[in-house]
Each structure stands twice: as C-alpha cells, then as structure tokens.
Amino acid sequence: MSFILALDQGTTSSRALVFDHDGTVRGLAQKEFRQIFPEPGLVEHDAEEIWASQLGVAVEAVARAGLSAADIAAIGITNQRETTVVWDRRTGKPIHNAIVWQDRRTAAECDRLKRLGLEATFRARTGLVLDPYFSGTKLAWLLDHLPGARDKAERGELAFGTIDSWLVWNLTGGERHLTDASNASRTLLFNIHEGNWDQELLQLLRIPPAILPEVVPSSQVYGETAARFFAARVPISGIAGDQQAALFGQLCDRPGMVKNTYGTGCFMLMQTGERPVLSERNLLTTVACRLGERTEYALEGSVFAAGAAVQWLRDGLGIIRSSEEVETLAATVPDNGGVYLVPAFAGLGAPHWDPYARGTLLGITRGSTAGHIARATLESIAFQTADLLEAMEADAATPLTELRVDGGATANNLLMQFQADLLGVPVVRPRVRETTALGAAYLAGLAIGYWQDRKELSRLWQAEQAFAPVLERERMAELRYNWNRAVERSKGWAQP
C-alpha cells in the first residue's frame, strides 16, 4: 500500500501530513518558525528556516506514520500565498528575508500606481486589487532596494518565487523553478485570462521576465526529490495555494459551490468553473486550479479578523483563558443583548476594503456581561462571512445551497449553528478537517493515477455534521440590519 505526503507550509508553521487512499491522516508533524518584525507594518520570514522546518516535518510525518520514503507515492505542496522570496540561482541562497503577505511596506507604491490610473488595468488582467498584500510590488521593492539586485535579475542570475517555488527548487536540488497557476494568480503579474505572465504589467513594475518561474498546472509530475533528502526519489506532482487547495479538498468542483476557512481570518472561495467572474463588489477573481489545459476560477473574499477576535478576548481583555472557552462563555446568554463587535483591528477586508476602519463595540448597557461580548465576538465572524457570501451570490448570479467549512473555529458548534441561521442554508463540516493539506494530496495523487478522477474523490468526501438553519428569517434580518449599522460606524475612524 502506498501513501501521499502533503507539505502544508503556513504563515506561522510548517506542517506535513501523510494520507492514505481513503483520505485519512496517517501521520502528522508540525514545527513553528520565527516571525520577524523589523519595524511596524513590516513582516518577514527567514526562507531558509522555512525550508529547514518543512523538510524536517516531512521526514518526521513519514516516520510517525510508521512508513519509509519508499511508501510515499507522491508529494503535494500547499502554501501561504503571496509571500515573496528571491534567491541566487548559483548559490541557492535568498538575497533577503521573505516578505510576508501581511507586510505593508509597498503601500506608497500601490498608491502611486493608483494615482497613475492603473488600478483598472491591474484589476482587469489579474482579477486583483492594487494592494501591498500581493507579490508583485514586494518583488519590485526587493529589486529596487537591494544593491545590485536589479542588475543580477536582468542577467538571469536571480530567481523569484512564492513559497511553493522555493520548496520545489530546494526539493529538486535546484533543478526546477516553477509555480502553479493558482499561486501565479496571486502575484499581480499574471494574466488570468491568457494564462501567462503579463508583459505590460511586468514593464509597469520593472520586473525582468528572466526572474520569473515557469507556470505549470496544479496537478502534474514536476520532478522528483533530490536523492539526499529521502531514501528514495519521490515524485512532486501537486501544487496549490492554501485557499485554493482547501477549495479542492472540500470537493467544491461545480460552479456555485463555496467553502469558508475559519482561521485567524476567514477566506471564502466560490468555484465559478471555467468562467472568470470579475467582481463588481470588491471581491477578488483568482485561479482555483489548472488541470491540464482546463483552468478553473474562483471568487474570493477575506475577513481580516475571525479567530483573531477571539484571541483578543483572551489576550487583550482576559475574559477567557483559552480560545476554546469562548463557546461556553457565549452560551451563558440567550442572545447578544444588543451588543455588536466589529473586529476591524486592522481595517475591514472584502467587500468593504476600508484600511481606516477600526474595532468598534456598540450597544453596551449596564446589563451587558462578558457573555454578551463573547457572543457578539462569535457573531461578528458569522456576520462578516454573510457579507462576503451576499457579495459573491450577487457577482456570480448563483444562489448558495450549502456552505462547506473548515479551519479551527469550525469546532465551535454555537458559531456554526448561528452561521447556518444567518445564511439560511446548511453549514457542513467535513469528516476530514485537514482540507488544505488534503487538497494538495488530491492534486498530487490525481497526477500519478493514485486516484483516477474527481468522481472517485467525491465518493471519499463525508460530512461529519450539517447545521441546518432553525431561527426565523425575520429575526436574522433584524440582526443583519443592526450589524450593518455597526459596520458603518466603524468605517474611516483612523482616516488621517
């Protein structure tokens, strides 16, 4: 019997999971790594530490499963997106720390491009907004600020990649410099309609084409691991950015199917099939995956503070000792008692995109308790999700029939039930909650025939629990109305 190894390289830790043919986790290892904050607004990672931690957990996960490298049929990779690495092709060494997706150092450059009237051009071609979040301006910053970097890039001596590219380069001993289409679509440099690097956008950001990786399908044998890393050379055959991998792992393979990942923030993706839907409501259009010549697309929206709001209750207010306690505390009251929290600690994401919004707690009376604040915090996660979903349904002209969910906060039954009540459709939690890693495993396995097709995969997907809506729609409409009032009060608070 053989197995698939999924490498799940995240923002705070590197993980590796071994899956069997039924999609069951047989081995898991995880290692955190340093977060580097040179100054406010700047976030970096040591790319070599990322590689070392990822290789270490890969070996450990296989050992914990009681297996050897000879038992691994293929490797799939999923990764934190947008985080930018540039390295020297000859030495294989990064020329600077990785600039993380959270980093805001290129805000002024994005503003400059907007003033030049270029946002519509970037949006139409890439499906993205001009924001420091994405890789393109990070890469331009590195070339502009590191002595000699631009000259080396022009001579083809440097390589750029998101984390998937960096891992593949190292796993193959420097033989392959590539990225999959889902990761390429997060760079601000990739034309999602033509499926290639956009030459005009490269010129606008002064990016030499020689520095870019080859763009490949999300499921294909790209190469094998170098012999020195494992006792056997293992095919690398699947890559997707973390949120696209979760969409694939949730088997959202038909237009209109939606998944929401509840983590520090929330990431919602709606599968739109082979049709890229350009949003009129501030959502992102992204490549979901490329399978052979077929490219599938998704609408995406993000919530900046979901689990982070619960962490604030723990670390900022001290009204809970662990994040798990929030459900118990929230259940001490029958409803929110008129209390609303807008957790805009770092502004508001889609569909509002207001960087100047700030956290707002409204409706407090002498009768308000810690339970009301805890409940308002959980409800804020569901409200923000509902805002995203409403925008997606309108953009895609496709009504939702169910929401598939994953991520740590889905263990909170009170939140999941309120989410179902608010949306008016079932919220479905899968049996296997490691959907991001599972998506990478599925992509890798399909490429080598470990699984034959998506029909076979769909038979593996099982719901652990479905939360059906039970509260009246009129009551939900009233809560949404008050939530919208609270959001409007939070907007623009930090405007200079």
Swiss-Prot record:
Protein name, UniProt field: Glycerol kinase
Task of the protein: Key enzyme in the regulation of glycerol uptake and metabolism. Catalyzes the phosphorylation of glycerol to yield sn-glycerol 3-phosphate.
Chain positions recorded as glycerol binding sites: 81-82, 133, 242-243
Family: Belongs to the FGGY kinase family.
Class of this enzyme: transferase
Record's catalysed reaction(s): glycerol + ATP = sn-glycerol 3-phosphate + ADP + H(+)
Organism field: Trichlorobacter lovleyi (strain ATCC BAA-1151 / DSM 17278 / SZ) (Geobacter lovleyi)
Lineage: Bacteria, Pseudomonadati, Thermodesulfobacteriota, Desulfuromonadia, Geobacterales
UniProt xrefs under InterPro entries: ATPase_NBD (IPR043129), Carb_kinase_FGGY (IPR000577), Carb_kinase_FGGY_CS (IPR018483), FGGY_C (IPR018485), FGGY_N (IPR018484), Glycerol_kin (IPR005999)
Record-level GO BP terms: glycerol catabolic process; glycerol metabolic process; glycerol-3-phosphate metabolic process
Protein residues bound to ATP: 11-13, 264, 307, 311, 408
Record GO terms (molecular function): ATP binding; glycerol kinase activity
Pathway stated in the Swiss-Prot or TrEMBL entry: Polyol metabolism; glycerol degradation via glycerol kinase pathway; sn-glycerol 3-phosphate from glycerol: step 1/1
Underlying gene: glpK
Keyword Transferase: yes
Origin: domain of life: Bacteria
Gene3D superfamilies associated with the record: 3.30.420.40
